[in-house]
Amino acid sequence: MSVHRDAIRAARSLVVKVGTNALTTSSGVFDSSRLARLVDAIEARMKAGTDVVIVSSGAIAAGIEPLGLSLRPKDLATKQAAASVGQVALVNSWSAAFARYGRAVGQVLLTAQDISMRVQHTNAQRTLDRLRALHAVAIVNENDTVATNEIRFGDNDRLSAVVAHLVGAEALVLLSDINGLYDSDPRKNTGARFVPEVTGSADLDGVVASRGSSLGTGGMVSKMSSALLAADAGVPVLLAAAADAATALTDASVGTVFAARPDRMSARRFWLRYAADSVGSLTLDEGAVWAVVQQRRSLLAAGITAVSGRFYGGDVVELRGPDATMVARGVVAYDATELAAMMGRSTSELPCELRRPAVHADDLVSI
């Protein structure tokens, strides 16, 4: 077994993401017995001493039948109505399944806005940490009943990657209806090549991923990008079929493993790079791009050539090169109006109170 699979097998804290297709029948009906079998596999891992946080899809699918709908709704209002009904059934099913083992569950509903705002981000982290300390199983889902298109994660694959870093998980396991990554859809192409490990971009050469199913939103494109996000932040990922959950959670010998970068990204840098909303941008000259990206130095006003957006000191902004390509994100020290007057001027030309870096190196992350 590879060292990357060993890392997942030995992890003492996991985030397990369960996709909609793992909880529904072939006809799209929510199936609580499938969920119960997944809980059996998860409980075995927990009994061995591993902390587990679950990110569960399926709320909208679980609400389809009770509302008399024949297909997954397409309009936002009906999706949210289905989610509000289905979330009750979903959490009750998780609760009943874990109650067989004497475990309580806690529901945590998040929106992208909860993660993008630093205070809410920290509060979510504390809640999840406290649930684990109290030996309750956190069941996390996107809050579909209030999330709009503008403040959505988009799917629970990305949410699971964010949660994995949020709780300091040592590994992320994505359980779906397919047994790993292929270079094309194996359901449509019998000659599709299985990819057992992803340790670099070369392993993804020729991979053509599919979009989501009719019941869920996260297709292979989503799973692959979310796995790469988590791995880039230092969290190894296993993508496997829900039918193989027991094996995946026991020894990680199935599915596709995504190797993590050796140095785990700090919580603040992860938030800056992947979770925080940016509210403006600064355009840099080539010298400033080199200093920020290659030398990891603070951004000074002298290297700024343009200021865009309405922002204030403490907001997150994008840093863009002369060709408009984003090269970094960071917390800006000044308001947009102040920077517009300061840009292009050397530190010695500025009043003493404006000689701090525009964006300090400690508040920067390269893209």
Swiss-Prot record:
Gene Ontology BP annotations: L-proline biosynthetic process
Chemical reaction(s) catalysed: L-glutamate + ATP = L-glutamyl 5-phosphate + ADP
A Pfam family it matches: AA_kinase
Annotated ATP binding sites: 17, 176-177, 217-223
Keywords, ordered alphabetically: Amino-acid biosynthesis, ATP-binding, Cytoplasm, Kinase, Nucleotide-binding, Proline biosynthesis, Transferase
Any one Gene Ontology cellular component term annotated for this protein: cytosol
Binding site for substrate: 57, 144, 156
EC number: 2.7.2.11
Enzyme class, spelled out: transferase
Localization, UniProt: Cytoplasm
InterPro entries given in the database record: AceGlu_kinase-like_sf, Asp/Glu/Uridylate_kinase, G5K_ProB, Glu/AcGlu_kinase, Glu_5kinase, Glu_5kinase/COase_Synthase, Glutamate_5-kinase_CS, PUA
GO MF annotation terms: ATP binding; glutamate 5-kinase activity; RNA binding
Domain of life of the native organism: Bacteria
Location of the PUA domain: 279-357
Family the entry assigns: Belongs to the glutamate 5-kinase family.
PANTHER family, A to Z: GLUTAMATE 5-KINASE, ISOPENTENYL PHOSPHATE KINASE
Function: Catalyzes the transfer of a phosphate group to glutamate to form L-glutamate 5-phosphate.
Record NCBIfam families: proB (TIGR01027)
Name of the molecule in the record: Glutamate 5-kinase
